[in-house]
Every structure is written in structure tokens, then in C-alpha cells.
Amino acid sequence: MDDLIIVDCQYDFIDGTLACAHSHEAVAWLIDFINTHEVRALYTSDWHSETNGSFKKNGGICPVHCVAGSEGAALDPSFPRDIKWSANRPSKENLFLKGLRDDVEEYSAFHGMNAEGKALHDVASSHVYVGGIASEYCGKETVLSLLQSGRSVTLLVPGLGWVAEEGHKKALAELKGLGALLVEA
């Protein structure tokens, strides 16, 4: 069975401090994909402390976002509510946290860890689908890491949210050029 890695579909990237374009549509599309395809869902979450170095208040460039345990860090509630097969709903086994270190900006979810201490790269299958938010940042870097590890990646374009459309298109072209397959519909 192939995996679907759902990158950072969290409140702050959907309706919060770093809300992205097409995020609501991406979540709905991903849920439909999960419900109509035989895949194993793996979720990633940005998970920061209040003292994270990427925050403007701490000398970084980003507004405060995805603080561990906050509303902003919560996955979209549609995932546990609307996914039919319970094993594909978010759980401690299939949720991988990244951005835990204050001194490192971690866009890629490749090294994200679940509650059992397993890294995403240790459990992901040889072929993965990827969707989520934001295509130019965490989505792109996660796909790059997966490709560099020798995995086959199918990027689900309708299941992506983005910061800026120009950056989104540029990221898609770059990833396609590096070997990712793009599914447009």
C-alpha cells in the first residue's frame, strides 16, 4: 500500500497567522482522495515552542504560528470527522511532528517524529503521494527529501495550498524537473 503524506494542514496555515490560498479546497480534496483510494495516511505538523527562532519576536521572519498544543497547531478538524476508515484518521502512530528545535528551521517533514519515536523517513513506503500546505515551503522541502532518499513521489496538485501562486507554480516546475510526478486533477 502506498502512503499519502499530508503536510501541515493546521489551523494557522488554513485560517490563522499564516493562512494560505487554496487551503480549504486542498483539505477537502485530500479527504476525498483518502476515502476513495487505498492509501495509508501519514500526517505532519509544525510544532513549535514559544521561543522558536523563526518567530519575529525571537529574531526570525515569521509570525508566531503552530505553537505546540495551541489552536493554531491543531490539524483541520475535517480529518478526524470526515475520513471514513478510522486507521487513516490522525493518531499518535501516524502524526509526525517537526520544528521542535528552536535553533533550526525545519521545513521538511522527512525527519519528523511520531509519539512512538519513529521518524517519517523510517515508515514511509517506497512510493508516496504528497499533499498539504504550503507547496513552496514545507511541501516542497518534504518532497525534495523524499526524492533524495530514492522514493518515488506523486504530488497531488489539487491537494495543495500555497502562500503565493507564483511561488507555487515555480515549486511545482522544480519538483517535476527533479522527478516528481504531478497529478493535476
What is each stretch, according to the model?
Residues M1-F96, S126, R151-T154, V163-E184:
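Active-site acidic carboxylates
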Residues I31-I34, Y137-Q148:
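Histidine-anchored nucleotide/phosphate-binding helix
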Residues S45, L97-L100, G132, V157:
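Short, structured patches in soluble enzyme cores that scaffold and shape functional sites
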Residues S54-F55, E106-A109, E141, E166-G167:
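Short, well-ordered secondary-structure micro-motifs
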Residues L75, A119-L120, T142, A171:
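Residues within well-ordered alpha-helices
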Residues R89-H121:
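Histidine/lysine/aspartate-rich catalytic loop segments that bind and position anionic ligands
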Residues D103-V104, L160-E165:
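Short, small-residue-enriched loops and turns at beta-alpha junctions
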Residues H127-E141, L155-L160:
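Glycine-rich anion-binding loop/nest that anchors nucleotide
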